[in-house]
């Protein structure tokens, strides 16, 4: 299931957003479901990250977290949660036209808000 991922630095709340296309494959992989990815997407909608992180002061992208934290010049003491996080390898190979369209429709707000694409 979807879970919030955040860091705290000097009382600044930093939300870490994920590419919705990568996130969907990772959540499918972690679910140990034996139905196909197409069916799983429809049966298991993820919560929009836009809503999950609405109380955060800053949002950074998971795939570039080290660089983004460096640019913010915020000392974060513990990044082990980010270092241990599973990211589905070759996640973009999972997509067909149908699944790409499904994720794009289901998570349109996150894709537009955070500037993601497949």
Feature locations, PLM:
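Membrane-interface amphipathic segments in extracytoplasmic regions
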Residues: 1-118
